[in-house]
Amino acid sequence: IAENIREVYRYYKQQGWNYQQYIACMDPLYEEHGLNPYSLTSDMYGKFLSELFECWYKDYRRGKQPYIRQFENYIGILLGLPPESCEQQGRCGIQYVVEADGSAYPCDFYMLDEYCLGNFNEHTIDYMDEQRKKIHFQEVSMRFSKECKSCPYIQLCRNGCQRNRVEQADGTYKNYFCDAYRF
């Protein structure tokens, strides 16, 4: 999709799909970013975002743009509104992703045994909230690198999704797609 976003955008519009959300392709958790044949590089993602924005903005000027969550959040941020997307809040929100068996996780990108907060058939929400605190899920998402804190783009980027961050030597995190947001 990243290499053909103009065609994808046109196709989605032809289908009447006016609500769109694009999530960057992620490498497996705990693996170094960019080593798989399908890996999305920061450069590719930056070009993707630029081309998608050009398509969207052209339609916006005609009053016929689809709702694209990321762009709508950017506009809201520029207008002083809080973004609803956790990726653009700069920290993980409090939410529960629940499997059919009742198992609950803090995020759909962290549905692994080590992140299981409990099970709705066996535990209370208070118990699951305590588990979330024990694994420091939200606290870790708020560790920005010094470079990020002083970056002129931090108000828009906010270091992105925790899942796309790379740990720095000082224990803070920097978004793998940082350069893409500066495109």
Language-model-detected regions and their locations in the chain:
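Radical SAM enzyme [4Fe-4S]-AdoMet core and its adjacent flexible, acidic
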Residues: I1-R91, V97-A100, M111-L117
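Generic marker of residues within folded, mature protein domains
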Residues: C86-Q88, C92, S141, Q168
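Flexible mid-to-C-terminal extensions adjoining Fe-S/redox cofactors in radical SAM and related proteins
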Residues: M111-F183
